[in-house]
């Protein structure tokens, strides 16, 4: 079937819109779909997403499409950019409308709610084995990407041809560098765990612990991410790249991160509901914390930072008490014998 668009993006929030703008700025005809018809009508009229990316005009190659069937019929390349807790339900909606030659990539960062499963497992459960799958991950703030500021990400998938095609679609010498990666599991995991650690970094700064504590938390958070990744068969080297260290540093150190700002509010004494309300958008790390904690427990992987953040978010522990417990842990070598 012939494409009338180069790619369809599902999800018209800040990140989905930013990726659609970036693709269209490359000269690729891009369709953007969202679940709210009123919001989509506003985007079409304004030629801008004033709610999430005010003042950034849509390129001519970006078209708004409120009809999911038409959006999915237009292209075999489908980029899903929705919160992790609705990822499965969006795929369920899309399934009967997908073309037989469809190829599915997502930029959603997270795990399945309650179970902590990777999104590739959710996608396979919903869609079966017939479609190539891929994931985009890396240090990307939506506003900077949409503005065309230099950014780098990684892509990995089940089909090398699809991965290479995505690199060609996304890569732009002026705005976006894209690295191919063969670690499908590692890229998915990095995007979820970094959200958890970013909440911890925000809490540390909110308490007033300073740069030393923040840096220690990021470093040990990377250790936890790598430990969990290796238990799932991921390549440890992945976590020194864009989807690991890169995304972790970005999210933990810049207040554009909702997860970091959420942690800051908690560290300054806000309760969970008040802190979420202050952000005003989805804080992926709130759910990710429970998902990552569940996964680590199931695999028997020690993740003390994640465990303390879980206790703050879901068991009412104060951030100060969580910090005290981490600091009072048994002394151990930084590089334990293998």
UniProtKB/Swiss-Prot annotation:
PANTHER family cross-referenced by the UniProt entry: GLYCEROL-3-PHOSPHATE DEHYDROGENASE (PTHR11728), GLYCEROL-3-PHOSPHATE DEHYDROGENASE [NAD(+)] 2, CHLOROPLASTIC (PTHR11728:SF1)
Q: Where in the cell is it found?
A: Cytoplasm
Its recorded reaction(s) are: sn-glycerol 3-phosphate + NAD(+) = dihydroxyacetone phosphate + NADH + H(+); sn-glycerol 3-phosphate + NADP(+) = dihydroxyacetone phosphate + NADPH + H(+)
| Pathway in which the depicted protein is active | Membrane lipid metabolism; glycerophospholipid metabolism
For this chain, one GO molecular function annotation is: NAD binding
Top-rank EC class of the record's enzyme: oxidoreductase
Source species, domain of life: Bacteria
Against PROSITE patterns, the record matches this protein to: NAD_G3PDH
Q: Name one Pfam family in it.
A: NAD_Gly3P_dh_N
User: Is the keyword Lipid biosynthesis in the record?
Assistant: yes
Q: Which GO terms describe its biological process?
A: carbohydrate metabolic process; glycerol-3-phosphate biosynthetic process; glycerol-3-phosphate catabolic process; glycerophospholipid biosynthetic process
Similarity-based family: Belongs to the NAD-dependent glycerol-3-phosphate dehydrogenase family.
Query: What coarse category fits the chief subcellular location reported for this protein?
Result: cytoplasm
Q: Which GO terms describe its cellular component?
A: cytosol
Where do the annotations place sn-glycerol 3-phosphate binding? 109, 138, 140, 194, 247, 257-259
Listed A to Z, the keywords are: Cytoplasm, Lipid biosynthesis, Lipid metabolism, NAD, NADP, Nucleotide-binding, Oxidoreductase, Phospholipid biosynthesis, Phospholipid metabolism
Alphabetized InterPro entries for the sequence: 6-PGluconate_DH-like_C_sf (IPR008927), 6PGD_dom2 (IPR013328), G3P_DH_NAD-dep (IPR006168), G3P_DH_NAD-dep_C (IPR006109), G3P_DH_NAD-dep_N (IPR011128), NAD(P)-bd_dom_sf (IPR036291)
So where's the catalytic machinery, residue-wise?
Answer: 194 (proton acceptor)
- Any idea what this protein is called? Glycerol-3-phosphate dehydrogenase [NAD(P)+]
Q: Which residues bind NADPH?
A: 14-15, 35, 109, 142, 258, 282, 284
Q: What does this protein do?
A: Catalyzes the reduction of the glycolytic intermediate dihydroxyacetone phosphate (DHAP) to sn-glycerol 3-phosphate (G3P), the key precursor for phospholipid synthesis.
Q: Which gene encodes it?
A: gpsA
Q: What EC designation does it have?
A: 1.1.1.94
């Amino acid at each position: 079937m012939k494409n009338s668009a180069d790619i369809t993006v599902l999800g018209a929030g800040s990140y989905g819109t930013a990726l659609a703008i970036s693709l269209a700025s490359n000269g690729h005809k891009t369709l953007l779909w969202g679940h709210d018809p009123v919001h989509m009508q506003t985007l079409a009229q304004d030629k801008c997403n004033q709610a999430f990316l005010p003042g950034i005009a849509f390129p001519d190659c970006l078209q708004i499409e409120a009809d999911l069937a038409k959006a999915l019929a237009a292209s075999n390349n489908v980029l899903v950019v929705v919160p992790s807790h609705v990822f499965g339900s969006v795929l369920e909606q899309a399934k009967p409308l997908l073309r037989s030659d469809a190829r599915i990539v997502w930029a959603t960062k997270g795990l399945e709610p309650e179970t902590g499963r990777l999104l590739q497992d959710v996608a396979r459960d919903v869609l079966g084995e017939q479609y190539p799958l891929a994931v985009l991950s890396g240090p990307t703030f939506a506003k900077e990407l949409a503005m065309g500021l230099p950014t780098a990400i990684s892509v990995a998938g089940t089909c090398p041809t699809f991965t290479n095609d995505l690199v060609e679609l996304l890569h732009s010498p002026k705005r976006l560098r894209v690295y191919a990666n063969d670690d499908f599991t590692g890229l998915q995991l990095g995007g979820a765990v970094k959200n958890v650690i970013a909440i911890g970094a925000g809490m540390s700064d909110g308490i007033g612990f300073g740069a030393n504590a923040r840096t220690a938390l990021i470093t040990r958070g990377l250790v936890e991410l790598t430990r969990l990744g290796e238990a799932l068969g991921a390549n440890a080297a992945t976590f020194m790249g864009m989807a690991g260290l890169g995304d972790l540093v970005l999210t933990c150190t810049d207040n554009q991160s909702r997860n970091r700002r959420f942690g800051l509010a908690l560290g300054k004494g806000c309760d969970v509901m008040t802190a979420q309300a202050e952000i005003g958008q989805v804080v992926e790390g709130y759910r990710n914390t429970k998902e990552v904690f569940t996964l680590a427990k199931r695999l028997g992987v020690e993740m003390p930072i994640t465990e303390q953040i879980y206790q703050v978010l879901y068991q009412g522990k104060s951030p100060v008490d969580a910090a005290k417990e981490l600091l009072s842990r048994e002394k151990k070598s930084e590089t334990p014998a293998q």
